Amino acid sequence: MDIEAFIHGGSGGGDADADHPLGIFSAADLSGFGFADSSTITGGIPNHIWPQSQNLNARHPAVSTTIESQSSICAAASPTSATNLNMKESQTLGGTSGSDSESESLLDIEGGPCEQSTNPLDVKRVRRMVSNRESARRSRKRKQAHLADLESQVDQLRGENASLFKQLTDANQQFTTSVTDNRILKSDVEALRVKVKMAEDMVARGALSCGLGHLGGLSPALNPRQACRVPDVLAGLDYAGDDPFTAGLSQPEQLQMPGGEVVDAWGWDNHPNGGMSK
């Protein structure tokens, strides 16, 4: 009944038609109706109308906000986590496999939320970090193996150097001894040469004396000293005049030898082979 009265009453009001030419009513005109919510009067959409669409529209911004916040958290946490991992890597340089497993577990813990992110840049960043860490670990192992090999080579070369230095010291000592022995041998050789020369001179003089003694009728078996002493012995003997062997002997005479030595000689005036002149 109220609606019919309102319709009939509204059709006769000129001011109302002037204010609302398109039939749109104000909130004051609709205040007489019993609407449950004031938003219905003001033109809003109440909460009990299209609840599923409203909830769906409300959920999508929340999901996008969560993803963006998670991506921003991962992006913000990536430098910090990388710094922490680099610090741990520098502290555990040259460590065992336990340190590597610890760093990998730490990487898994810190990179877990980022791996769940839908942003491909974050996924690539995490994969690149893992790849760099693995490459660094392999490089450390190669460097450690190369360093151990170099240390073993250094030890071996040091041993060889010590052995060669000892051999060089022994060779120098032997060389010094050989030089000293060579000098001694040279002096001995010079002394022997002098002795040989003296012996040759003595042999030459002895041969000459023996030749002179042979010419004088002396036995050639006598040595030079005995040949030189024979005239002295013969000078002290008494010669018999009737002895045919001593009849031709006269007093000895001195002869000057080429070496400066003076010897005695006897003349054979009555010798059958002839006499020896001075």
Curated annotation (Swiss-Prot):
<feature type="region of interest" description="Disordered">
    <location>
        <begin position="85"/>
        <end position="119"/>
    </location>
</feature>
<feature type="region of interest" description="Leucine-zipper">
    <location>
        <begin position="150"/>
        <end position="164"/>
    </location>
</feature>
<dbReference type="InterPro" id="IPR046347">
    <property type="entry name" value="bZIP_sf"/>
</dbReference>
<keyword id="KW-0805">Transcription regulation</keyword>
<dbReference type="InterPro" id="IPR045314">
    <property type="entry name" value="bZIP_plant_GBF1"/>
</dbReference>
<feature type="domain" description="bZIP">
    <location>
        <begin position="122"/>
        <end position="185"/>
    </location>
</feature>
<keyword id="KW-0238">DNA-binding</keyword>
<keyword id="KW-0539">Nucleus</keyword>
<dbReference type="InterPro" id="IPR004827">
    <property type="entry name" value="bZIP"/>
</dbReference>
<comment type="function">
    <text>Probable transcription factor that binds to the DNA specific sequence 5'-TGAGTCA-3' found in seed storage protein gene promoters.</text>
</comment>
<dbReference type="InterPro" id="IPR044168">
    <property type="entry name" value="RISBZ3/4/5"/>
</dbReference>
<keyword id="KW-0804">Transcription</keyword>
<dbReference type="GO" id="GO:0005634">
    <property type="term" value="C:nucleus"/>
</dbReference>
<feature type="region of interest" description="Basic motif">
    <location>
        <begin position="124"/>
        <end position="143"/>
    </location>
</feature>
<dbReference type="GO" id="GO:0003677">
    <property type="term" value="F:DNA binding"/>
</dbReference>
<protein>
    <recommendedName>
        <fullName>bZIP transcription factor RISBZ4</fullName>
    </recommendedName>
</protein>
<dbReference type="Pfam" id="PF00170">
    <property type="entry name" value="bZIP_1"/>
</dbReference>
<dbReference type="GO" id="GO:0003700">
    <property type="term" value="F:DNA-binding transcription factor activity"/>
</dbReference>
